[in-house]
Regions:
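Conserved beta-strand signature within the Rossmann-like core of class I S-adenosyl-L-methionine
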Residues: 235-243
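Conserved class I S-adenosyl-L-methionine
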Residues: 96-108, 127-130
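Core SAM-dependent methyltransferase catalytic element
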Residues: 207, 248-271
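Conserved SAM-binding loop of SAM-dependent methyltransferases across substrates and taxa
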Residues: 107-122
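A short glycine-rich, Lys/Arg-flanked "PGG" loop and its adjoining helix->strand segment in the class I
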Residues: 223-235
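Extended basic-aromatic, gly/pro-enriched interface segments that bind polyanionic ligands
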Residues: 127-209, 213, 221, 246-247
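Conserved AdoMet
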Residues: 1-101
Length: 271
């Protein structure tokens, strides 16, 4: 069992060594991530993990994926994408440049979902899409756009709920063991490493998706990240959070509810 003191000491050592601040992440989630990491590498003590994390940069870069479990899939929560298609994106039908940020994009399934929706609305070629994540390994997979073929049947169910007559072959090139996102989608996404907790964001966006990311944060860290997202949104822009995310009271002072069911919030025009 990992004690609070051991966890705090390890997180502080990581912060001092790599500049990554996990001190306000949800403690139970971090402890479970550490247990997964130790089991995966057959480590018997936290001291053994501590030494490896602080001495081996490549090991730590890969360990981030075990510390932070990514929740993502193609067309996850179809009603969100239907709301985007039938309401939110209609407001940008005549704009020349639509800017969208996927904050915490994980392995890219949600990014490519948005690209498919944008194409359907005739907006893909007028949209600048930025997708960021803390994990370099997740970003590499997202850039490649390669997913195990067996996942396609799983992803087909929510896709059909969104668009009943869709075929995966319209969006992916299939090979024996995997499917690859068609280049017309990959070419319109810029993937970058970004830490929501410590890194600034100088660009401005009409839509930001930060879904199932804040579940790992305590209230203090949620407020800090929401400040960043608020500043990055243009007035009248939309923030979309995940079904497992809970908007804290502080966030409710920044954003107004657009659609509670789909967790869509709006930055007031006068902000």
């Amino acid at each position: 069992m990992i004690s609070e003191e051991e966890l705090s000491a390890l997180m502080m050592a990581i912060k001092n060594r790599y500049g990554l601040d996990f001190t306000n992440y949800e403690k139970g989630s971090l402890k479970r991530g550490i247990v997964r990491l130790m089991s995966k590498h057959h480590m018997e003590s936290l001291i053994e993990l501590w030494g490896r994390v602080l001495k081996d940069h490549d090991f730590f870069a890969n360990a981030i994926d075990d510390l932070l479990v990514n929740l993502t899939e193609l067309f996850r929560n179809p009603d969100v994408w239907i709301k985007l298609r039938d309401d939110i994106l209609l407001q940008y039908g005549t704009v020349n440049n639509l800017n969208i940020w996927h904050a915490g994009c994980s392995t890219g399934e949600e990014v490519y979902t948005m690209a498919i929706v944008l194409e359907e609305k005739g907006l893909l070629y007028r949209t600048n899409v930025l997708a960021t994540d803390l994990s370099s390994r997740a970003l590499a997979k997202a850039r490649g756009g390669n997913y195990p073929r067996q996942l396609m049947n799983q992803y087909l169910t929510p896709l059909i709920k969104y668009f009943p007559f869709s075929r995966m072959e319209d969006y992916f090139d299939f090979e024996k063991s995997h499917a690859t996102v068609k280049s017309r989608y990959k070419d319109h996404v810029r993937f970058e490493r970004h830490n929501l907790v410590t890194d600034p964001m100088h660009e401005r966006f009409e839509i930001i998706l930060c879904r199932n990311v804040m579940i790992y944060f305590d209230e203090k860290l949620k407020s800090k990240v929401l400040d960043l997202l608020f500043q990055a949104l243009r007035p009248g822009g939309y923030l979309i959070i995940g079904y497992y995310d809970i908007m804290p009271d502080y966030g409710k002072t920044l954003f107004k509810v657009k659609d509670l069911q789909t967790r869509i919030y709006q930055k007031p025009l006068d902000s």
